Each structure stands twice: as C-alpha cells, then as structure tokens.
UniProtKB/Swiss-Prot annotation:
It comes from Pyrococcus furiosus (strain ATCC 43587 / DSM 3638 / JCM 8422 / Vc1). InterPro entries: DNA_clamp_sf, Pr_cel_nuc_antig, Pr_cel_nuc_antig_C, Pr_cel_nuc_antig_CS, Pr_cel_nuc_antig_N. SUPFAM superfamilies: DNA clamp. This is DNA polymerase sliding clamp. Keywords: DNA replication, DNA-binding. Sliding clamp subunit that acts as a moving platform for DNA processing. Responsible for tethering the catalytic subunit of DNA polymerase to DNA during high-speed replication. Unlike its eukaryotic paralog, loads on circular DNA without the replication factor C (RFC) clamp loader, although RFC greatly increases loading efficiency. Stimulates the ATPase activity of replication factor C (RFC) in the presence of ssDNA. Stimulates the helicase activity of Hel308 and may alter its substrate specificity. The gene is pcn. GO terms for biological process: leading strand elongation; regulation of DNA replication.
C-alpha cells in the first residue's frame, strides 16, 4: 500500500478541493512523507494555486514512498462533497492506478477513482515586491467580493496607513467597503506606500469560496501587481493564490 491517509472532518477537506476545482480541471498532487502538496495554474493562466498540507494535520499519515497522483478535480469534488462535517475521510492508493476514497460516518462508503496523467507544474512562487499587506476576516472578504459582483466585473484594492478599501465601479453604480483597525474585520495592516490595484471579481469569487467566517486571510499586493492571498488550514496547512491584476486603461 503506497499510502493511507486519514483526515477527520471530511467536509473541511471537501471545501478545499471544491475551491481549487472552480479554477482548475485537473491536478497533480505530490504525496510525500512530509505531506501533500499541489501547484497549478488555471487554463487562462491568470491564477496560480499552491496547496500545502503537512502530515501533522492528518490523524493518520502513512506513505511508503513519494508519489505524484493525477486526478480529475470535478470527479474528486463531487465525491468529497458527499462527506459531512463529522465524517472521517480515508485516502488510499494500492498498486493499481486508482485512488480509493472512503467516507466513514453513519455508514462506510468507498469510491474508487481512476488516476490520470497530469503534467506537473515546476513553477516557484515568485518573490514580489509587495507594498501592502492586510489581514482580514474571511467573512468580510467574501461579502466584499459579493457586493462588488453586483456592480462590476473588477474590484480595486486600496491600502493606506491604517485603512483598507475595496471598491467597485459600474456604469451607473458603485460600492465601497472601508476597513480600519477599529473594525473587527481588519486584523492587521502594513503599508509601505499608498497601494492600488484592481482584480477580476469572477476569479476572486472562486478563490474565497472555501473561506469560513472566522478564517484569517492574508492579502499582499503592490501597485498594478499580482495579489497573493493566503489562508491556513488547521494552523499548519496553507492554501495560497497568486492572481494577476486587471490593468486599467
């Protein structure tokens, strides 16, 4: 048995895969003794996704030898969404080219998914000269993106000293969400200079899909630069997105 991995709380794991599946059709997951990782770009090459789940967040983690498995994200998502919050998720791979997915709750359900050939992405997360860093609650970011979607297909992020603004402007409507450190929704802000950049609402909508209300989200960006959005899974796991900017005319 090349690996057997157990995660308590099937629904939480499903939300991670659901978020990624909205941006990519297939993925190559690296399974090593240290944990599970995946890096991929969406077909339009606008968003880079980087997932890192260390072995410590799993209740059981046994890997005989490092392996890379390719999966269809839509198929994986549909199966994992059958799990509930208190269900146990078990991932196994034997010698055959299948991933065995078991969901244990009021009953034990086992699915076998064929693995596929997926080209591994050998791309490093670039070190960018960000000039602004903000930490917000997941609920606030999700609401802001939803508000922006009502009036425009892009949203502008503006960071000033002690102030973070998310703003969208349509032909006849506009919306502005302003946060200061006095607001519960803004947890931290570091600004080297006033920073502005716009991003596509549709991509952000997919990126924030898996956020919980109390999740802390770290956003880093620069003037008309890519935005890095990151949040943690059980303190040690991490999901990171790098989103290309919308260059304004």
């Amino acid at each position: 048995m090349p690996f057997e991995i157990v995660f308590e709380g099937a629904k939480e794991f499903a939300q991670l895969i659901d978020t990624a599946s909205k941006l990519i059709d297939e993925a190559a997951f690296k399974v090593t003794e240290d944990g599970i990782s995946m890096r991929a770009m969406d077909p339009s090459r606008v968003v880079l996704i980087d997932l890192n789940l260390p072995s410590s967040i799993f209740s059981k983690y046994e890997v005989v030898e490092p392996e890379t498995i390719g999966v269809n994200m839509d198929h994986l998502k549909k199966i994992l969404k059958r799990g509930k919050a208190k269900d146990t998720l078990i991932l196994k791979k034997g010698e055959e080219n299948f991933l065995e997915i078991t969901i244990q709750g009021t009953a034990t359900r086992t699915f076998r998914v064929p693995l596929i050939d997926v080209e591994e992405m050998e791309v490093d997360l670039p070190e960018l000269p960000f000039t602004a860093k903000v930490v917000v609650l997941g609920e606030v970011l999700k609401d802001a993106v939803k508000d922006a979607s009502l009036v425009s297909d892009s949203i502008k992020f503006i960071a000033r000293e002690n102030e973070f603004i998310m703003k969208a402007e349509g032909e006849t409507q506009e919306v502005e969400i302003k946060l200061t450190l006095e607001d519960e929704g803004l947890l931290d802000i570091e600004v080297q200079e006033e920073t502005k950049s716009a991003y596509g609402v549709s991509y952000l909508s997919d990126m924030v899909k898996g956020l919980g209300k109390a999740d802390e989200v770290t956003i880093k960006f620069g003037n008309e630069m890519p935005m890095q959005m990151e949040y943690y899974i059980r303190d040690e796991g991490r999901l990171t997105f790098l989103l290309a900017p919308r260059v304004e005319e």
